[in-house]
A protein has these predicted regions:
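Helix-to-loop junction immediately C-terminal to a conserved catalytic motif
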Residues: 48
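Catalytic Walker B motif of ABC-type/P-loop ATPase nucleotide-binding domains
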Residues: 148-152, 157
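ABC transporter nucleotide-binding domain
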Residues: 167-252
Length: 284
């Protein structure tokens, strides 16, 4: 399965929500990264046919864009999925099957996939936040789509539920394209094969986590500063971590200039997020 996106653009009045996006995606998990307003939801909504692009093309192997077959290829989990909370899990999926003309025999198998089979007779309003999110994924995958899109699926979940969700998506990813939009970049650690960075509707970068770390490590420095000088460094540089050491602090920061400080031995995905979006949060 392949998605070919060429020169994709979308405007809202005079504002560019997406600005000439070109990507080629094959099977695997992708993290779609960016702060609020970066264009992530618009991008996913265009991909699954909810809204129309203004220019550019989308090709999906042999499937014609927006044809009847196209809608069977995609599963979509929006940021705020509509769940009928007075229904049981089983009743809700029966409704989804009727809506999509899918055999109801798929329900038990799908509930087992998302680890909700034991809750099939429980009303949705009694489920935890993590269970509701897994049920949202169940309704999106019940027809076994080849492409699964998830918009901020980990928002509001505790660390245990986030880990369960990551494991579920990893198990679902064989021979599928899964795109997960998030501003919590650490959720993509050891999950996404590549990260797609959006900012103001533009594509900033598209690399594997390992490639990103190798290419950006040169911009990160570390040093030890006194408590008295700490604020000066925070105001001068984009500081990504502060660790107390006795009466001093070990700080990590990035700079596009050649600094006289030692380079960091290690950086992580949170450092990379700050590298791309530190200026966005400085303005808030």
């Amino acid at each position: 399965m392949n998605i070919y996106i060429n020169d994709l653009s979308k405007y809202y009045k005079n504002k560019k929500a997406l600005d000439h996006i070109t990507l080629h995606l094959s099977s695997g998990i992708y993290g779609l990264i960016g702060p609020n307003g970066a264009g992530k939801t618009t991008f996913l909504s265009i991909l699954c046919g909810l809204i129309k692009n203004d220019s550019g093309t989308i090709e999906i192997d042999e499937v014609k864009f927006l044809s009847d077959d196209f809608y069977h290829v995609f599963g979509y989990v929006p940021q705020s999925p509509a769940l009928y909370v007075d229904l049981t899990c089983n009743e809700f999926l029966e409704y989804i099957c009727a809506l999509k003309s899918i055999d109801k025999n798929q329900i038990d198998h799908t509930l087992r996939l998302v680890n909700l089979y034991d809750q099939k007779s429980i009303k949705i309003k009694k489920l935890s936040g993590g269970m509701k999110q897994r049920l949202s994924i169940a309704q999106a995958i019940i027809n076994d789509p080849q492409i699964l899109l998830l918009d901020e699926p980990t928002t509001g979940l505790d660390p245990i539920e986030r880990l369960r969700l990551k494991n579920l998506l990893r198990n679902l990813s064989k021979n599928k394209i899964i795109i997960i939009s998030t501003h919590i970049i650490q959720d993509m650690d050891h999950l996404a094969k590549s990260l797609i960075f959006f900012k103001n509707g533009q594509l900033l970068d598209f690399k594997s986590p390992q490639e990103l770390i190798l290419s950006l490590k040169q911009f990160f420095y570390e040093t030890i500063v006194s408590k008295k000088d700490l604020q000066k460094y925070i105001e001068t540089y984009h500081v990504s971590s502060i660790v107390p050491i006795n009466d001093d602090y070990k700080i990590k920061f990035f700079s596009h200039k050649d600094e006289l400080f030692p380079h960091c031995k290690e950086i992580n995905l949170e450092d990379i997020y700050l590298y791309y979006y530190g200026d966005v949060y400085d303005k808030r």
